């Protein structure tokens, strides 16, 4: 009998051991089960820059940066959307999922370990996510986000989202200014692929974000241009501060999303509108030297763009049809140098000095300080020319450098940069800002166009803010004749699983994407 009990005991112990071994199958003996706080950072910085490029395939068509010619007019070129699709919602996915609990864990660890610099960067990333999402989608989920006890979520107002961005940025600045605790440049640098652990540059980045946020209030009585200018002055001081992500180009996931090898834009073409801003049509016949360094010529060597209202290439011959952004007619040129940002190794920005100087110029102009506005505007245009040259050297692309003589002649043209501050116009500021943000600053560019209702006019000159821009005449049927103002929330998380939350904000309406944003209203 004792032998039976002994055998049973041995059997139970063996079963327990086997069960434990089975439960251990998800433990990798060759990899850590937990990671240090700084190792959460690299993929989030990657998506911070790359996600807007994903959604840029769609935002760029609302704003007529690019068009997608085909045998019928494209949905997004008509300011519509793709039903039952996640198109246009990469940022939504990446902020709530790729950042999601990872960002929560990183910030909790950083705070517990008194790594105030890493905590500050985390707060910037959190603010960045809210800013990008609310500018794309309007009302978003903030208070209940990443709550693992919930299965459905309530939306928050855009006003609240904007206030939360400001709060997070102010907290981030305070934390990044701290030198106590376990603040450590080398530790932060291990995961910081943007600024290599430089707290000073992250502080400047936070002020830049604050400037962008505050400037979006331009249509409201609470708009304070002096606060916008003050934030810009504490942000980037030159192109050396630009927030750039370098792509190693070792495999598909770390190749620039706009790059030739990934081929995401081989069927896209530049529009008549953007060509018109640069070929002399919009600005007194002055040809922009950036035209031949940013845009693609047709096979006959001329620069043309397509009209989103015209099916395909219209009446253009094969020699007249503009090449794709890589500089090729179709799929040719794989792994060959591209053009400007459309190259495998081209660095993509999250924010630039030029962009922020345009923000300062607009704020100063609105405040009536035309001298400050002109100085900032000139800095903005000049620094973007330098930016174009730098990006075309990232991988020795096939565009020549803009010479000092070309740059000087362009900046000396009164149609581009007036000598008299009183002659500066909003048309110049906003159109040149459009060029400077072309194909990377999608969300800010679209916010600008919505703030000016796409076809708004300069109150001083009566001229269009964006000369040559016309909304499509054949708008998407669900629009009801209205232009687009937001992208619908992500289909597979919201329209499938969170319909009650959407219903509360009117998100189930077929024309929800045409509802103006709170921030653009008086």
Predicted features along the sequence, with ranges:
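Bacterial N-terminal signal peptides that target proteins for export
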Residues: 1-6
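Hydrophobic helical h-region of N-terminal Sec-dependent signal peptides
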Residues: 9-11
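Bacterial Sec-type N-terminal signal peptides, specifically the leucine/valine-rich hydrophobic h-region
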Residues: 15-16
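Membrane-proximal, proline-rich intrinsically disordered regions
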Residues: 19-75, 79-82, 333-338, 453-522
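Structured, solvent-exposed acidic/aromatic patches
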Residues: 35-38, 69-392, 419-426, 432
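Surface-exposed intrinsically disordered loops and tails
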Residues: 185-188, 310-325, 393-420, 462-478
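C-terminal/domain-terminus segments
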Residues: 229-234, 240-246, 445-467
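Active-site/pore-lining binding-face segments in mid-to-C-terminal subdomains
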Residues: 378-463
């Amino acid at each position: 009998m004792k032998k039976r009990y002994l055998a049973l005991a041995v059997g139970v112990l063996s079963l327990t051991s086997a069960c434990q071994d089975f439960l251990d199958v998800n433990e990798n003996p060759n990899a850590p089960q937990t990671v240090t706080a700084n190792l959460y950072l690299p993929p989030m910085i990657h998506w911070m820059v790359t996600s807007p490029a994903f959604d840029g395939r769609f935002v760029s068509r609302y704003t007529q940066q690019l068009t997608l010619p085909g045998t019928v007019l494209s949905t997004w070129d008509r300011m519509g959307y793709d039903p039952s699709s996640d198109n246009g919602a990469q940022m939504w996915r990446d902020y709530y999922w790729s950042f999601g609990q990872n960002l929560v864990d990183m910030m909790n660890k950083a705070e517990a370990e008194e790594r105030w610099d890493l905590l500050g960067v985390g707060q910037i990333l959190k603010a960045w996510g809210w800013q990008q999402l609310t500018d794309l989608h309007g009302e978003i989920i903030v208070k209940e986000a990443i709550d693992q006890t919930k299965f459905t979520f309530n939306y928050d107002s855009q006003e609240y989202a904007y206030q939360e961005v400001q709060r997070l940025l102010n907290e981030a600045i305070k934390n990044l200014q701290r030198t106590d605790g376990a603040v450590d440049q080398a530790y932060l640098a291990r995961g910081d692929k943007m600024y290599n652990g430089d707290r000073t540059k992250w502080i400047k980045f936070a002020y830049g974000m604050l400037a962008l946020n505050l400037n979006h209030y331009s249509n409201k009585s609470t708009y304070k241009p002096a606060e916008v200018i003050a934030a810009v002055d504490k942000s980037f001081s030159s192109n050396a501060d630009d927030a750039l992500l370098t792509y190693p180009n070792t495999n598909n996931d770390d190749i620039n999303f706009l790059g030739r090898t990934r081929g995401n834009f081989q069927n896209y073409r530049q529009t008549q509108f953007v060509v018109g801003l640069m070929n002399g049509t919009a600005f007194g016949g002055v040809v922009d030297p950036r035209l031949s360094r940013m845009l693609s010529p047709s096979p006959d060597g001329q620069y043309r763009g397509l009209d989103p209202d015209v099916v395909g290439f219209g009446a253009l011959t094969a020699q007249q049809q503009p090449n794709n952004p890589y500089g090729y007619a179709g799929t040719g040129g794989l792994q060959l140098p591209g053009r400007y940002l459309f190259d495998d190794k081209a660095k993509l920005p999250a924010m630039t000095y030029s962009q922020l100087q345009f923000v300062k110029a607009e704020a100063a102009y609105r405040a009536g300080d035309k001298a400050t506005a002109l100085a900032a505007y000139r800095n903005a245009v000049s620094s973007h020319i330098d930016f174009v040259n730098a990006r075309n050297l990232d991988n020795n692309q096939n565009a020549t450098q803009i010479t000092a003589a070309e740059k000087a002649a362009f900046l000396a043209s009164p149609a581009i940069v007036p000598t008299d501050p009183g002659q500066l116009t909003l048309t110049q500021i906003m159109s040149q800002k459009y060029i400077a943000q072309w194909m990377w600053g999608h969300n800010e560019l679209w916010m600008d166009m919505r703030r000016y209702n796409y076809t708004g006019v300069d109150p001083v000159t009566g001229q269009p803010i964006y000369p040559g821009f016309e909304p499509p005449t054949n708008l998407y049927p669900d629009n009801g004749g209205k232009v687009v103002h937001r992208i619908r929330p992500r289909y597979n998380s919201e329209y499938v699983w969170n319909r009650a939350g959407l219903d509360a904000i009117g998100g189930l309406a077929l024309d929800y994407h045409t509802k103006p944003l709170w921030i653009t209203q008086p």
